From Swiss-Prot:
Record-given protein name: Inner capsid protein VP2
Top-level taxonomic group: Viruses
Gene Ontology molecular function: RNA binding
Compositionally skewed regions (Basic and acidic residues) per UniProt: 19-30
Annotated source species: Rotavirus A (strain RVA/Cow/United States/NCDV-Lincoln/1969/G6P6[1])
Subunit structure: Homodecamer; each decamer is made up of two conformers of VP2, called VP2A and VP2B. Interacts with a VP1-VP3 complex. Interacts with the intermediate capsid protein VP6. Interacts with NSP5. Interacts (via N-terminus) with NSP2.
Region feature Disordered, mapped onto this chain: 1-38
Family under the similarity heading: Belongs to the rotavirus VP2 family.
HAMAP family the record matches: Rota_VP2 (MF_04123), Rota_VP2_A (MF_04127)
Assigned keywords, A-Z: Capsid protein, Inner capsid protein, Repeat, RNA-binding, T=2 icosahedral capsid protein, Ubl conjugation, Virion
Residue ranges of the region described as Hydrophobic: 394-414, 422-442
Amino acid sequence: MAYRKRGARREANINNNDRMQEKDDEKQDQNNRIQLSDKVLSKKEEVVTDSQEEIKIADEVKKSTKEESKQLLEVLKTKEEHQKEIQYEILQKTIPTFEPKESILKKLEDIKPEQAKKQTKLFRIFEPRQLPIYRANGEKELRNRWYWKLKKDTLPDGDYDVREYFLNLYDQVLTEMPDYLLLKDMAVENKNSRDAGKVVDSETASICDAIFQDEETEGAVRRFIAEMRQRVQADRNVVNYPSILHPIDYAFNEYFLQHQLVEPLNNDIIFNYIPERIRNDVNYILNMDRNLPSTARYIRPNLLQDRLNLHDNFESLWDTITTSNYILARSVVPDLKELVSTEAQIQKMSQDLQLEALTIQSETQFLTGINSQAANDCFKTLIAAMLSQRTMSLDFVTTNYMSLISGMWLLTVVPNDMFIRESLVACQLAIVNTIIYPAFGMQRMHYRNGDPQTPFQIAEQQIQNFQVANWLHFVNNNQFRQVVIDGVLNQVLNDNIRNGHVINQLMEALMQLSRQQFPTMPVDYKRSIQRGILLLSNRLGQLVDLTRLLAYNYETLMACVTMNMQHVQTLTTEKLQLTSVTSLCMLIGNATVIPRPQTLFHYYNVNVNFHSNYNERINDAVAIITAANRLNLYQKKMKAIVEDFLKRLHIFDVARVPDDQMYRLRDRLRLLPVEVRRLDIFNLILMNMDQIERASDKIAQGVIIAYRDMQLERDEMYGYVNIARNLDGFQQINLEELMRTGDYAQITNMLLNNQPVALVGALPFVTDSSVISLIAKLDATVFAQIVKLRKVDTLKPILYKINSDSNDFYLVANYDWVPTSTTKVYKQVPQQFDFRNSMHMLTSNLTFTVYSDLLAFVSADTVEPINAVAFDNMRIMNEL
């Protein structure tokens, strides 16, 4: 045996040799205990086996039945010093373990509504920049000129399509698009103001500062800057702020101001924000002890139901999202309190079993795995799995009849769909062949794998006993009822389970089974089954209460679920040991546990935040897909767009999602309509593409190709360069048209006739690489002939900056030499900065306060748990 007698009274005739042997045994046991505690604390798993010496001693003990029964009773006493050893050594393999995966829980809880981020600056694509002016002879003048340039000119070098730049720009706008703007929060002091006036944001202030200090600024402009300040209209709760913005940026910010998502907030809205079932639950006392100011605002969460139907044909994604929901749900299911003492319960069970030597092997297993940790774990697993609709699998030992009888309670209260079919069939088959069929003397059921009927469905047709057949009928038809509550699809338990009446039905069936003769089985077998049933039936009242408690906690937490509870079996399962179900049935006390209001609010907030973020990311992805389609980038960017969408949901491991699900997700996203604000923003970008291209230093509007040398020309912004500002006199061919048709005969003929040709269309403008090679990479079939006929190395566009302080190029002393190029880049002039045209007044509310956590205003408490009532206005736990 693994446990030895210590300090037990010996018979009076024990000799000295026995006493010496006893001392040696005590020392050996002490060493074993020290080693055992080390093993328990270590994470290394090892199989616990008896040593040869202990086996020999056990053989000797078996010689006397009296000694054997004493040995057994000593184990069952489970004194305090033995308790941990028993739980961790004998029962270690039967206790279910759960790793909380805190990283996933943290990811879920860290998803905050992005709307609440505070805007400190206006949205801008452009910024004014000073550029030098070059004289006709190429020298740089001392004076400067202001132009609007792109703030983030992020066009990468190399093979890059300008249309991709606009797609990335749109993505950037969607990321930065504020859901509300409060100008008062971002306003800063105007340093050059006479009366400490304020301008709309820090960038406007820095632009004003730079212009004020520029020597060429007119006096009238300086005087205007000194007068720039906010204008308050207190009666209308409105304030106007001066701003310096490019007209396109002004259009963006004006649109954001006109389409803010904030709505007035009052007590009624907060009250209605609380799930209705929690508001109406008499166990929770909710109070709002403050009135909100009239300037209170909130952003309504976007709680549209799942438009992608992730449960339908997205096995990997569905598994991930249900796992995350399961981990979150486990963290909020309350812990059981005041469970029956494990020691006392095992003692009582051993008395009920009237354990004797003959029944040691079968009936001592009944006590295996019974401990409070397993009971609590089972309670949490059942509720969390139902809340997240995670499929469960059952682990059990067929010879442990107590586990199977507990499994009958489990199958009674939990719908069949919650278990993976193979596991459900195995458990039902074990119950049928171990308990039900032997009771009536029926032959073993030989179940064929793949049979559409479950063992219980087959048994229901063959069992003549009304009570047993009635119970089997209930289990076979135990399904969730789908009920839409507050627009959310809920999976609701059967009313007979919610009020606990089904347990009486189960007990009637068990009593009928225990009264049967088991004609084909030995007497010991019949007695073992009867005693197992007796153990469970002795706790009828507690089982009714447990069932009501389980249903109440499930439905209360379910009120905080905001996404439709779709029931689809998951790829992976949550393991449930039937020994832990036995622990729950045997150790449940009479203490009611219900979720604390703070826990409910936390669970509700996390669900709302994830759901709202999910919908916003869908809207972003749909908008980007539509934009890619309209920019003719549909095929090129599609998978990257879907991957980006999944990454922004935080919980998915994108690299492991199969490609077929990625493309299915793309197809679903493609069918959804674009949200209005996002569509308007894209149209704003489309209308102003030309202005944005002009402001970039890396985008040109075309390229001129010639066979003969073309002289460099003076440009006011760059000096002597091969940049053309107009296309007068050149034959023009549309670059997009050329790429689409693939007809390049026209361009080839022109070049062979030494006629310069201008290919017009946006293209990357990189000064140190070949324009032709860049174009050729866009479509090799179109430009292959051109590249083959010409020396590509001679076609590099050259950017000559000729002035005294330039390191780029120095003129040689040969005045007959004229720098030339065989290509010119066609680049339109960016918009010149005009202070008067850039001055805009922006209007917003003078002040309002946005509240993100609405439930912070609600103070909540519960009634004394002992008084908590279920849906039928009866106490949840009646057995006191």
